[in-house]
């Protein structure tokens, strides 16, 4: 990226990376997930550093995820919490570290640690909808694992908020009300007016996606709090999972 092309730009938001759950986690796919995030971010950070003396962007909002925290049970996690263990934690640490050239050049760098984004056309919800719509949905495993979610509306608004407000470092992009997988399944079934009583044993998804993906994406418990957003006065459009799912699926507020 030619640094001159960045002159006059005030801020850059960079979220690119291969889909986490698009394919089975083979060794090559895991390497693709990592490198698609770190290499592009490193190149962008270097270009931003070179552009800064020329009048380039002052702000970089770079992608990350709550996978940074790993499987933590019922522990309440804030931006100050230490990293967890596992592949996704390793990816997030490397992804955030890839911005260091921009940080050293004096840009304000903020990392968007995003949770489960509720979108009908992509992500976890898009994969669950077909099962739940025909009455085959239910909790995964024990169902006690926490899911930290955010509506797509709030995700976009939070990214804009990170540009406009003087925040640097990690920012948890999740709604304040994390729920268990059982609660999520019941609420989704209610919104769709379908039963959600069929528990899904981990073996089924593991055969399709691989045990590593299932363990870290479906069975891991991550109870994350949006401390920076809430402390900075960010106004969530959706505090209720039911309300967020209704708007996402039916296109209108609850």
Please tell me what each predicted stretch does.
Residues 30-32, 41-86:
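Conserved Rossmann-fold NAD(P)-dependent oxidoreductase catalytic core, especially the SDR/UDP-sugar
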Residues 158, 164-212, 246-254:
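Mid/C-terminal beta-alpha module of Rossmann-like enzyme folds, strongest
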């Amino acid at each position: 990226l030619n640094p001159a092309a960045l002159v006059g730009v005030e801020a850059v938001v960079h979220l690119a990376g291969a889909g986490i759950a698009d394919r089975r986690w083979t060794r090559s796919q895991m390497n693709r997930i990592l490198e698609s995030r770190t290499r592009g971010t490193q190149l962008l950070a270097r270009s931003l550093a070179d552009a800064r003396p020329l009048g380039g962007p002052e702000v970089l909002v770079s992608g990350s995820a709550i996978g940074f925290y790993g499987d933590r049970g019922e522990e309440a996690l804030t931006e100050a919490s230490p990293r967890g263990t596992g592949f996704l934690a390793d990816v997030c640490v490397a992804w955030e570290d890839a911005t260091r050239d921009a940080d050293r050049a004096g840009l304000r760098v903020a990392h968007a640690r995003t949770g489960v984004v509720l979108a009908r056309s992509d992500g976890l919800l898009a994969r669950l909808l077909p099962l739940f719509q025909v009455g085959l949905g239910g909790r995964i495993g024990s169902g006690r694992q926490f899911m930290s979610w955010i509506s797509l509306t709030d995700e976009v608004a939070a990214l804009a908020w990170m540009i406009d407000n003087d925040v640097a470092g990690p920012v948890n992009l999740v709604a304040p009300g994390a729920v268990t997988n059982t609660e999520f399944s019941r609420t989704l079934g209610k919104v769709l007016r379908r039963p959600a009583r069929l528990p899904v044993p981990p073996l089924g998804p593991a055969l399709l996606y691989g045990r590593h993906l299932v363990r870290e994406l479906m069975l891991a418990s991550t109870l994350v709090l949006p401390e920076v957003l809430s402390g900075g006065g960010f106004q969530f459009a959706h505090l209720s999972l039911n309300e967020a799912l209704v708007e996402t699926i039916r296109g209108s507020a609850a």
